[in-house]
Amino acid sequence: MSDFRIIEEKWQKAWEKDRIFESDPNEKEKFFLTIPYPYLNGNLHAGHTRTFTIGDAFARYMRMKGYNVLFPLGFHVTGTPIIGLAELIAKRDERTIEVYTKYHDVPLEDLLQLTTPEKIVEYFSREALQALKSIGYSIDWRRVFTTTDEEYQRFIEWQYWKLKELGLIVKGTHPVRYCPHDQNPVEDHDLLAGEEATIVEFTVIKFRLEDGDLIFPCATLRPETVFGVTNIWVKPTTYVIAEVDGEKWFVSKEAYEKLTYTEKKVRLLEEVDASQFFGKYVIVPLVNRKVPILPAEFVDTDNATGVVMSVPAHAPFDLAAIEDLKRDEETLAKYGIDKSVVESIKPIVLIKTDIEGVPAEKLIRELGVKSQKDKELLDKATKTLYKKEYHTGIMLDNTMNYAGMKVSEAKERVHEDLVKLGLGDVFYEFSEKPVICRCGTKCVVKVVRDQWFLNYSNREWKEKVLNHLEKMRIIPDYYKEEFRNKIEWLRDKACARRKGLGTRIPWDKEWLIESLSDSTIYMAYYILAKYINAGLLKAENMTPEFLDYVLLGKGEVGKVAEASKLSVELIQQIRDDFEYWYPVDLRSSGKDLVANHLLFYLFHHVAIFPPDKWPRAIAVNGYVSLEGKKMSKSKGPLLTMKRAVQQYGADVTRLYILHAAEYDSDADWKSREVEGLANHLRRFYNLVKENYLKEVGELTTLDRWLVSRMQRAIKEVREAMDNLQTRRAVNAAFFELMNDVRWYLRRGGENLAIILDDWIKLLAPFAPHICEELWHLKHDSYVSLESYPEYDETRVDEEAERIEEYLRNLVEDIQEIKKFVSDAKEVYIAPAEDWKVKAAKVVAESGDVGEAMKQLMQDEELRKLGKEVSNFVKKIFKDRKKLMLVKEWEVLQQNLKFIENETGLKVILDTQRVPEEKRRQAVPGKPAIYVA
């Protein structure tokens, strides 16, 4: 790849020298495209490479389509991860040293110097800038910034004053993900594991021990099923009895630890062996029915309270566990449980759906569940049943006051009533585990008092976001439903913390705005950053009045100039820039940000800006794995952008990552495939270089075929790129055209240069360096700024395409037959009889068998053949659009030499030498073939 790297560096320097990707307002239609700025606690990796390359390919495509494209990027450094990393390096943490030297490619001597957040930011921002330039992104680097810049902090302060004025920031008590070591709420960027974990609210239902005051608090997501409880499950291990707000609770050790992070008054009383309670009874709240306590190994003591209520009619796991226990005489004997206690347990149906009988029983039977070990099948049954009952279920008469209610309503009502009556409570838990902070500590759910929260549960705010979502373009479109659901479920979110890098809350300086909350409207800051980096705008100029005017159009420019100490002309120029560029036309991002950043991006734009400045489109791409393994920047394996470019070159890296999977699918980086692609790209380069400057002679049918194929490719690529389908686009622009060109050259084509201008331009967004090098063999302009090829239907030659497809199919068929004939010397070819050609032409244009036959029977020759014509029409009708209607005799005679060269056989056009049975099978476009 060394020669490719020379080419790449040459054009990167030229682009930078001539500043061709610096964008300012002009008379063209604008296109403002952004990608998430990377977090600088490590080197950029293949995940960044994918998201950023998709963004860059689209930016280049839109630029060549004639748009004035703004494609900027900054660097994200706020929050705790960088501080945590500096501490770990300062402590010479072995695992950290290994990860950063082995996976992030940081030389040990450099790494050991990175003992402060400032040094880390300086090092990785320099590395990131170098990597981003080395892969050839068409970014306007005048607008780069980091989120600890003083000017950026003024911008964030302005944003948060706006949100506070709107009543969208509140102080309250909420459950948050929390690191006990850092004593801080944590967000996705702060985590080593569990980035997608959300906080789930369980209903705790208090089952009191019969003849006692000990409470067995069962945590459930389905409080409405309390009427169907037949027993409770406890794991045969050590639990604790704790005093919780004056009550005695029986909970797992893990649950006790979690309770200490709530607002409850909690005190440990004693540890107990759970087995001493097996066979005893508890009272079911509301219905006052007694049910037994039974052992279950499946109970997860690290999930909620570690005590589980059993509803076998509506919970497939419970039903399977009860049936297993009935057969497990050893366990029953071990804990002194009378078998009759378990035998007497019968499911209690309490929800009506279209499932007859006991719903859990029916699903278990249908799925073939044999025992509780069939976890996947039971998971499937549970999800199916819960979804059906939640959306369509009606509570039956045995559910007291809740009879006749929809399950979705009863769930809320039962929860409220249990809590009101003192029979229920709330327990917060993670949706998935483990959740590990970057410092290595296991996180908990903590109920935090007097914390600043973004009021995302505000119904009016949600409705505005939901209404705008319907007007937006989401790519792929099925993600719109996911956005809708996540917006509906989004709750108030802690937006501040006491430790980390970042901007302090302007009205409460003890708190710092956390890293997901200071990165929601920074796309607007790119407009300001150009002036900041030019030295025309400083932090002291960025008064609230200035930002109100340039970003919202509020105020009078003269007064703003006075307050900000800037000229009226400069302020107006910045305002005009903002008016020209905003809103963001496309935000292209990885799918990991759908549940957080992209939601907050929508909420904050809708809150702060007028509707005409709200985002227009969001595109969501999948993850990247490495040789089938999930990548991790904190644990490995990892492929850095820098290493990929050094090893394979920029254009190979770009082409591969764009073609590895369609936009919304996950991609897998496979070194062997990358090396194969590098060879393909080299062949393309050499092919164009050898043919580009050749004179184009008189055009043949074969040349017209090549031009036609190029037009098909142009149409396909444009359609694909308009929908951000980069795999489809690269496939058409590179791989399929390479196949066509190979065929063209096999056929003896000599005018390849006729398509090379279009081909170079077509491929330029994907492999810009090689295309720039080739383009300059003939032109002085930058191909990156040329017009993208337009589809021209008048240059499509369907007849030429049919001829080449006919020949390709014929050669392949002969070669296939030849495999089964030893010592083959000749091939006899017999095209279909004339009457079949005549019939096929009618059938090809007909939409109805009857109509076709009616028309054909008007022909005297065909009428004589009667039944034979009828059978033939039926045979070809289904695939009539695929019929290869060419002048076969003429095509064969003109291409005898080619067929002979390709097959190594002497071609004889003699129908009589082909066996009659084979001749009868011939159809137009698919002649009878006999190899001898």
UniProtKB/Swiss-Prot annotation:
Motif ('KMSKS' region): 630-634
Enzyme kind, highest EC tier: ligase
Reactions catalysed according to its record: tRNA(Leu) + L-leucine + ATP = L-leucyl-tRNA(Leu) + AMP + diphosphate
EC assignment: 6.1.1.4
Superkingdom per UniProt: Archaea
GO cellular component: cytoplasm
Protein's GO biological process: leucyl-tRNA aminoacylation
UniProt GO molecular function: aminoacyl-tRNA deacylase activity; ATP binding; leucine-tRNA ligase activity
Location of the motif 'HIGH' region: 38-48
Compartment list: Cytoplasm
Key word Ligase present: yes
Positions with a binding annotation for ATP: 633
Gene3D superfamilies per the UniProt record, alphabetical: Class I aminoacyl-tRNA synthetases (RS), HUPs, Isoleucyl-tRNA Synthetase, Domain 1, leucyl-tRNA synthetase, Valyl/Leucyl/Isoleucyl-tRNA synthetase, editing domain
Keywords attached to this entry: Aminoacyl-tRNA synthetase, ATP-binding, Cytoplasm, Ligase, Nucleotide-binding, Protein biosynthesis
Residues forming coiled coils: none
SUPFAM superfamilies: Anticodon-binding domain of a subclass of class I aminoacyl-tRNA synthetases, Nucleotidylyl transferase, ValRS/IleRS/LeuRS editing domain
Protein name, entry field: Leucine--tRNA ligase
Gene name as annotated: leuS
